[in-house]
From Swiss-Prot:
Native species: Locusta migratoria
GO biological process: neuropeptide signaling pathway
Biased composition (Low complexity): 17-28
Subunit field text: Monomer.
Keywords: Hormone, Neuropeptide
Protein name, as recorded: Ovary maturating parsin
Keyword hit for Transcription: no
Gene Ontology MF, one: hormone activity
Protein backbone atom coordinates (compact mmCIF):
# COMPACT_ATOMS: atom_id res chain seq x y z
CA UNK A 1 0.00 0.00 0.00
CA UNK A 2 1.08 3.62 -0.29
CA UNK A 3 1.51 6.12 2.49
CA UNK A 4 2.04 9.81 1.83
CA UNK A 5 3.37 11.90 4.71
CA UNK A 6 1.17 14.78 5.89
CA UNK A 7 3.63 17.46 4.70
CA UNK A 8 3.19 16.42 1.06
CA UNK A 9 6.48 14.56 0.57
CA UNK A 10 6.17 11.15 -1.02
CA UNK A 11 7.57 8.01 0.49
CA UNK A 12 8.61 4.89 -1.32
CA UNK A 13 6.05 2.14 -1.59
CA UNK A 14 5.99 0.08 1.55
CA UNK A 15 5.12 -3.62 1.54
CA UNK A 16 1.66 -4.26 2.90
CA UNK A 17 1.58 -5.85 6.36
CA UNK A 18 1.05 -9.58 6.23
CA UNK A 19 -2.50 -10.65 7.00
CA UNK A 20 -3.10 -13.77 9.06
CA UNK A 21 -3.63 -16.83 6.88
CA UNK A 22 -6.85 -17.76 8.68
CA UNK A 23 -9.07 -15.16 10.28
CA UNK A 24 -9.86 -15.94 13.91
CA UNK A 25 -13.39 -17.20 14.40
CA UNK A 26 -15.68 -14.83 16.26
CA UNK A 27 -17.24 -16.26 19.40
CA UNK A 28 -20.74 -17.62 18.88
CA UNK A 29 -21.91 -15.36 21.71
CA UNK A 30 -21.43 -12.25 19.58
CA UNK A 31 -24.81 -10.87 18.46
CA UNK A 32 -23.82 -10.62 14.80
CA UNK A 33 -22.75 -14.27 14.85
CA UNK A 34 -26.14 -15.25 16.25
CA UNK A 35 -27.93 -13.18 13.59
CA UNK A 36 -25.77 -14.72 10.87
CA UNK A 37 -26.55 -18.23 12.08
CA UNK A 38 -30.28 -17.45 12.20
CA UNK A 39 -30.15 -16.00 8.67
CA UNK A 40 -28.26 -19.05 7.41
CA UNK A 41 -30.85 -21.37 8.95
CA UNK A 42 -33.71 -19.30 7.51
CA UNK A 43 -32.12 -19.29 4.06
CA UNK A 44 -31.65 -23.06 4.17
CA UNK A 45 -35.28 -23.59 5.22
CA UNK A 46 -36.56 -21.22 2.51
CA UNK A 47 -34.47 -22.98 -0.14
CA UNK A 48 -35.76 -26.37 0.98
CA UNK A 49 -39.37 -25.13 0.88
CA UNK A 50 -38.91 -23.64 -2.58
CA UNK A 51 -37.32 -26.85 -3.83
CA UNK A 52 -40.17 -28.93 -2.40
CA UNK A 53 -42.74 -26.66 -4.08
CA UNK A 54 -40.85 -26.93 -7.37
CA UNK A 55 -40.84 -30.73 -7.09
CA UNK A 56 -44.61 -30.71 -6.44
CA UNK A 57 -45.18 -28.55 -9.52
CA UNK A 58 -42.98 -30.81 -11.64
CA UNK A 59 -44.99 -33.85 -10.56
CA UNK A 60 -48.22 -32.04 -11.50
CA UNK A 61 -46.87 -31.29 -14.95
CA UNK A 62 -46.00 -27.70 -14.08
CA UNK A 63 -49.59 -26.49 -14.13
CA UNK A 64 -50.09 -24.80 -10.76
CA UNK A 65 -52.53 -21.89 -10.63
Amino acid sequence: YYEAPPDGRHLLLQPAPAAPAVAPAAPASWPHQQRRQALDEFAAAAAAAADAQFQDEEEDGGRRV
